Amino acid sequence: MKVLTARQQQVYDLIRDHIAQTGMPPTRAEIAQQLGFRSPNAAEEHLKALARKGVIEIVSGASRGIRLLMEEETGIPLVGRVAAGEPLLAQEHIECHYQVDPAMFKPSADFLLRVSGMSMKDIGIMDGDLLAVHKTEDVRNGQIVVARIDDEVTVKRLKKQGNMVHLLAENEEFAPIVVDLRQQSFSIEGLAVGVIRNSDWS
Protein backbone atom coordinates (compact mmCIF):
# COMPACT_ATOMS: atom_id res chain seq x y z
CA MET A 1 0.00 0.00 0.00
CA LYS A 2 1.25 3.47 -0.91
CA VAL A 3 0.58 6.08 1.78
CA LEU A 4 1.53 9.68 0.98
CA THR A 5 1.99 12.46 3.48
CA ALA A 6 0.04 15.66 2.86
CA ARG A 7 3.15 17.38 1.45
CA GLN A 8 4.00 14.43 -0.79
CA GLN A 9 0.43 14.45 -2.08
CA GLN A 10 0.77 18.18 -2.86
CA VAL A 11 3.92 17.50 -4.89
CA TYR A 12 2.24 14.61 -6.69
CA ASP A 13 -0.87 16.69 -7.44
CA LEU A 14 1.29 19.54 -8.77
CA ILE A 15 3.12 17.17 -11.13
CA ARG A 16 -0.15 15.65 -12.33
CA ASP A 17 -1.80 19.04 -12.88
CA HIS A 18 1.26 20.46 -14.64
CA ILE A 19 1.31 17.50 -17.03
CA ALA A 20 -2.43 17.92 -17.67
CA GLN A 21 -2.04 21.63 -18.42
CA THR A 22 1.25 21.73 -20.34
CA GLY A 23 1.84 18.17 -21.47
CA MET A 24 5.11 17.94 -19.55
CA PRO A 25 6.21 17.57 -15.92
CA PRO A 26 7.48 20.59 -13.95
CA THR A 27 11.16 21.19 -13.21
CA ARG A 28 12.47 21.01 -9.63
CA ALA A 29 12.67 24.81 -9.62
CA GLU A 30 9.03 25.11 -10.68
CA ILE A 31 7.94 22.69 -7.95
CA ALA A 32 9.93 24.66 -5.36
CA GLN A 33 8.44 27.96 -6.53
CA GLN A 34 4.85 26.68 -6.63
CA LEU A 35 4.95 25.05 -3.19
CA GLY A 36 7.14 27.61 -1.43
CA PHE A 37 10.24 25.45 -0.94
CA ARG A 38 13.47 27.33 -0.29
CA SER A 39 15.36 25.56 -3.04
CA PRO A 40 14.99 22.99 -5.83
CA ASN A 41 16.92 20.60 -3.57
CA ALA A 42 13.92 20.44 -1.23
CA ALA A 43 11.72 19.50 -4.17
CA GLU A 44 14.25 16.83 -5.14
CA GLU A 45 14.00 15.23 -1.69
CA HIS A 46 10.21 14.96 -2.01
CA LEU A 47 10.57 13.49 -5.50
CA LYS A 48 12.97 10.86 -4.16
CA ALA A 49 10.46 9.97 -1.43
CA LEU A 50 7.70 9.62 -4.03
CA ALA A 51 9.98 7.43 -6.15
CA ARG A 52 10.74 5.20 -3.14
CA LYS A 53 7.00 4.75 -2.63
CA GLY A 54 6.59 3.76 -6.26
CA VAL A 55 4.22 6.54 -7.32
CA ILE A 56 6.67 8.28 -9.68
CA GLU A 57 9.75 7.33 -11.65
CA ILE A 58 12.70 9.74 -11.85
CA VAL A 59 14.42 9.72 -15.24
CA SER A 60 18.05 10.71 -14.67
CA GLY A 61 19.70 13.40 -16.77
CA ALA A 62 16.54 15.35 -17.57
CA SER A 63 15.27 18.45 -15.75
CA ARG A 64 11.69 17.33 -16.40
CA GLY A 65 12.43 13.63 -16.02
CA ILE A 66 9.42 12.66 -13.91
CA ARG A 67 6.94 9.94 -14.85
CA LEU A 68 3.75 9.25 -12.88
CA LEU A 69 3.13 5.63 -11.91
CA MET A 70 0.30 5.80 -9.37
CA GLU A 71 -3.30 5.36 -10.42
CA GLU A 72 -4.69 8.13 -8.30
CA GLU A 73 -8.36 7.25 -8.50
CA THR A 74 -7.97 4.38 -6.03
CA GLY A 75 -6.71 6.66 -3.25
CA ILE A 76 -8.98 7.81 -0.42
CA PRO A 77 -7.83 10.80 1.66
CA LEU A 78 -7.47 10.32 5.41
CA VAL A 79 -8.71 13.38 7.27
CA GLY A 80 -6.82 14.11 10.46
CA ARG A 81 -7.58 16.65 13.14
CA VAL A 82 -9.99 19.34 11.92
CA ALA A 83 -9.57 22.95 13.01
CA ALA A 84 -12.71 24.75 14.15
CA GLY A 85 -14.72 26.31 11.36
CA GLU A 86 -12.66 24.89 8.51
CA PRO A 87 -13.86 22.54 5.74
CA LEU A 88 -13.40 18.87 6.58
CA LEU A 89 -11.60 18.13 3.31
CA ALA A 90 -9.31 21.17 3.36
CA GLN A 91 -5.88 20.18 2.04
CA GLU A 92 -4.14 20.89 5.35
CA HIS A 93 -6.37 18.34 7.12
CA ILE A 94 -5.45 15.46 4.82
CA GLU A 95 -2.78 13.35 6.53
CA CYS A 96 -2.21 10.91 3.68
CA HIS A 97 -4.00 8.82 1.05
CA TYR A 98 -4.86 5.13 1.44
CA GLN A 99 -4.81 3.03 -1.69
CA VAL A 100 -8.28 1.59 -1.23
CA ASP A 101 -10.88 1.32 -3.98
CA PRO A 102 -13.73 3.69 -2.95
CA ALA A 103 -16.18 1.38 -4.72
CA MET A 104 -15.62 -1.37 -2.13
CA PHE A 105 -18.03 0.63 0.05
CA LYS A 106 -21.72 1.19 -0.76
CA PRO A 107 -22.25 4.03 -1.41
CA SER A 108 -18.66 4.77 -2.35
CA ALA A 109 -16.33 6.34 0.22
CA ASP A 110 -15.09 9.89 -0.38
CA PHE A 111 -12.77 10.11 2.62
CA LEU A 112 -11.57 8.32 5.74
CA LEU A 113 -11.88 9.80 9.21
CA ARG A 114 -9.78 8.63 12.15
CA VAL A 115 -12.07 7.65 15.04
CA SER A 116 -11.25 9.17 18.42
CA GLY A 117 -12.74 7.60 21.53
CA MET A 118 -14.97 4.62 22.30
CA SER A 119 -18.45 6.16 22.05
CA MET A 120 -19.40 3.84 19.14
CA LYS A 121 -17.71 0.65 20.33
CA ASP A 122 -20.91 -1.41 20.64
CA ILE A 123 -21.28 -1.48 16.84
CA GLY A 124 -17.60 -2.22 16.27
CA ILE A 125 -16.25 1.30 15.70
CA MET A 126 -13.18 1.49 17.93
CA ASP A 127 -10.71 4.20 18.92
CA GLY A 128 -8.12 4.58 16.16
CA ASP A 129 -10.24 2.91 13.46
CA LEU A 130 -10.57 4.55 10.06
CA LEU A 131 -14.21 5.32 9.28
CA ALA A 132 -15.08 5.31 5.58
CA VAL A 133 -17.43 8.21 4.84
CA HIS A 134 -19.64 9.03 1.84
CA LYS A 135 -19.88 12.82 1.59
CA THR A 136 -23.57 13.72 1.57
CA GLU A 137 -26.13 15.74 3.50
CA ASP A 138 -28.92 13.33 2.50
CA VAL A 139 -29.21 11.08 5.56
CA ARG A 140 -32.05 9.41 7.46
CA ASN A 141 -32.86 8.78 11.09
CA GLY A 142 -31.05 5.74 12.44
CA GLN A 143 -27.99 6.09 10.21
CA ILE A 144 -24.44 6.61 11.47
CA VAL A 145 -23.36 10.09 10.40
CA VAL A 146 -20.44 12.47 10.62
CA ALA A 147 -21.95 15.64 12.06
CA ARG A 148 -20.58 19.10 12.79
CA ILE A 149 -21.94 20.93 15.83
CA ASP A 150 -20.68 24.47 16.38
CA ASP A 151 -17.38 23.57 14.66
CA GLU A 152 -16.91 20.25 16.49
CA VAL A 153 -17.00 17.07 14.37
CA THR A 154 -18.47 13.86 15.81
CA VAL A 155 -19.59 10.39 14.68
CA LYS A 156 -22.98 9.30 16.05
CA ARG A 157 -26.33 7.71 15.19
CA LEU A 158 -28.81 10.33 13.96
CA LYS A 159 -32.26 10.92 15.42
CA LYS A 160 -33.99 14.12 14.30
CA GLN A 161 -37.34 15.32 15.67
CA GLY A 162 -38.51 18.73 14.47
CA ASN A 163 -36.02 21.36 15.60
CA MET A 164 -34.19 18.92 17.87
CA VAL A 165 -31.42 16.55 16.84
CA HIS A 166 -30.28 13.71 19.09
CA LEU A 167 -26.87 12.23 18.29
CA LEU A 168 -26.77 8.83 19.94
CA ALA A 169 -23.65 7.00 21.07
CA GLU A 170 -23.35 3.22 20.84
CA ASN A 171 -21.90 2.93 24.33
CA GLU A 172 -24.06 3.25 27.45
CA GLU A 173 -21.32 5.26 29.17
CA PHE A 174 -21.94 8.18 26.77
CA ALA A 175 -25.03 10.37 26.99
CA PRO A 176 -26.76 11.54 23.79
CA ILE A 177 -25.73 14.89 22.34
CA VAL A 178 -28.82 17.09 22.00
CA VAL A 179 -28.77 19.89 19.44
CA ASP A 180 -31.38 22.66 19.22
CA LEU A 181 -31.36 23.75 15.57
CA ARG A 182 -32.83 27.13 16.57
CA GLN A 183 -29.81 27.95 18.71
CA GLN A 184 -26.86 25.91 17.44
CA SER A 185 -25.04 25.52 14.16
CA PHE A 186 -25.44 21.98 12.84
CA SER A 187 -24.57 20.26 9.57
CA ILE A 188 -24.09 16.75 8.19
CA GLU A 189 -20.64 16.10 6.68
CA GLY A 190 -21.31 12.56 5.51
CA LEU A 191 -22.65 9.05 6.00
CA ALA A 192 -20.57 6.26 7.55
CA VAL A 193 -20.27 3.42 5.02
CA GLY A 194 -17.63 1.15 6.57
CA VAL A 195 -14.73 0.71 8.95
CA ILE A 196 -11.09 -0.13 8.32
CA ARG A 197 -9.29 -1.46 11.37
CA ASN A 198 -6.06 0.50 11.53
CA SER A 199 -4.05 -2.61 12.49
CA ASP A 200 -4.93 -4.04 9.06
CA TRP A 201 -2.55 -1.49 7.50
CA SER A 202 0.41 -1.73 9.83
Curated annotation (Swiss-Prot):
InterPro entries: LexA, LexA-like, LexA/Signal_pep-like_sf, LexA_DNA-bd_dom, LexA_repressor, Peptidase_S24_LexA, Peptidase_S24_S26A/B/C, WH-like_DNA-bd_sf. It comes from Pectobacterium carotovorum subsp. carotovorum (strain PC1). PANTHER family: LEXA REPRESSOR, LEXA REPRESSOR-RELATED. Residues 28-48 bind DNA. Belongs to the peptidase S24 family. It catalyses: Hydrolysis of Ala-|-Gly bond in repressor LexA. Its EC number is 3.4.21.88. The gene is lexA. Keywords: Autocatalytic cleavage, DNA damage, DNA repair, DNA replication, DNA-binding, Hydrolase, Repressor, SOS response, Transcription, Transcription regulation. Represses a number of genes involved in the response to DNA damage (SOS response), including recA and lexA. Binds to the 16 bp palindromic sequence 5'-CTGTATATATATACAG-3'. In the presence of single-stranded DNA, RecA interacts with LexA causing an autocatalytic cleavage which disrupts the DNA-binding part of LexA, leading to derepression of the SOS regulon and eventually DNA repair. GO terms for biological process: DNA repair; DNA replication; negative regulation of DNA-templated transcription; proteolysis; SOS response. This is LexA repressor.
